Amino acid sequence: MATTTDLEKLRVLLPHWIEHNAEHAAGFQEWAEKARAVGQEEVAEEIALAAKELGWANEALSAALKKLEQAA
């Protein structure tokens, strides 16, 4: 069972993870464009997919944060 301290940590960690993932996703998009520019379309597609998946992860983390805030 989560302790109050664990819940407090989650309130700090979730926004941090969301921001961190967004920064990585932006970097992935930048590198996908660079890969595309040098003719590496398949590589670019995989990197872009990773960026998109981080976006999905952030949606889940944001939903978790919202539920945590509603429970408070």
Regions found by a protein language model. Give the residues of each.
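N-terminal acidic leader/helix
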Residues: 2-29
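Short, charged, intrinsically disordered terminal tails
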Residues: 4-7, 62-72
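Amphipathic alpha-helical coiled-coil segments and their boundaries
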Residues: 7-10, 14, 40-43, 47-50, ...
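Alpha-helical transition-metal enzyme core signature, strongest for iron centers
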Residues: 17, 21-25, 47, 51-61
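Short E/K-rich amphipathic alpha-helical oligomerization segments
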Residues: 22-46
